[in-house]
Amino acid sequence: MYLTKEEEQILNGEAGETLRQAIQILVALGDIYGADRLIPIKSAQIAGVSYKTIGDAGLEWISDLEGQVKVPAILNPAGMDLEDWERLRISPEFAEKQKEIVQAYKKLGIRCECTCTPYTLEGFSVSYGDHLAWSESSAISYANSVIGARTNREGGPSALSAALLGKTANYGFHLDKNRVPEVSVSVECSLKESDYGALGYVAGKLIGNRVPIFQLRSKPEKDELKSLGAAMAASGAVALYHVKGVTPEACRMDFEEPEEKIIIERSQLDEVYESKGKEPELITIGCPHCSAAELKKAAELLKGKTVSKETWIFTSRELAERYPEYIRTIEESGAKVVCDTCMVVSPATNSYSCVMVNSGKAFAYVPGMCGAQSVYGNMEACINKATGGKERKAGDSH
């Protein structure tokens, strides 16, 4: 792997121990995957933020690092709402450790808006062809597929290393040859809303880590593409997909039709909706974090109603502050709008035995990461389950 003179000096420790560790990680990955050199990146998105997932060892490692990131960098969701952690019954001990983790990242110059949808934030723009070092699976999929940027599935340490250096190793999805579709997926039904999450859950299991190209009967919105990619990244390991006539590379590139073809039928999606579980104790929406359009829809569905089950709606703090009217309407129902975290990486979910989700990603992750059953429905079904379809009465305390 070719290194410039400056990069060799960094590897030799002449720029300090933190940068030596960082370039050592990237060079090791580059050697494993056959990278020819390091390339500059536009931004980094760093996983390994929740105390639930990284523990004391992770906190100690991050705290020992020095210096400042060279490119815009942002954090993945933490293990709690950083401003209102008590209402989800997070312990003070966990909260203290979580705050230490965020502060350790902040001292490195990293933006501490903890979200899995960084592409929605002001001042964190991503464009077609940009090279990135992102590490949250749904954000990787969105950047690669919906925007046409280029990032591998970075781990937390490699994304942080890339942020500190402003570079990453040139392999994988940074190269044209690895962005070519490997399997064609034909969907034999029209889709809307959470159907795309169900499709992603089914397709990910069939595709694994390959690059699919979809032939769809419906034209998906960006939130639906977000759901599709997030679910495929969770049930499989898909980091890049194409949709004929929709996603940018499928529109710009003249891809050859893959030899392998998969057909997915409505009955396979119905199996996701019909998954059996206990009566849900918790309703969760926003995995990945809700967009403005999704917050608006949740507010419309909850207006004038009262939830009778614990209901959490996750979004980024920036969007929650940008749309206070949606947040107010949602919370008047008794539902909680939660920022900085999600149902998967927060320990708060662990006290429930069955969780209803409108996300194929959460449907895949909740059983393994939270020890709960997951049942699936669209946003309207989730809110109907939360409210029992009941209108809020005059004088209701919510």
Swiss-Prot record:
Cofactor note: Binds 1 [4Fe-4S] cluster per subunit.
UniProt binding sites for [4Fe-4S] cluster: 116, 287, 342
Superkingdom assignment: Archaea
Keywords: 4Fe-4S, Iron, Iron-sulfur, Isoprene biosynthesis, Lyase, Metal-binding
Lineage: Archaea, Methanobacteriati, Methanobacteriota, Stenosarchaea group, Methanomicrobia
Known catalytic reactions: (R)-5-phosphomevalonate = (2E)-3-methyl-5-phosphooxypent-2-enoate + H2O
UniProt key word Iron: yes
Annotated residues for binding of (R)-5-phosphomevalonate: 48-50, 76-77, 136-137, 361
Enzyme class: lyase
InterPro entries: PMDh-L-like_dom
CDD domains: AcnX (cd01355)
GO biological process, one term: isoprenoid biosynthetic process
Keyword check for Iron: yes
Protein name: Phosphomevalonate dehydratase large subunit
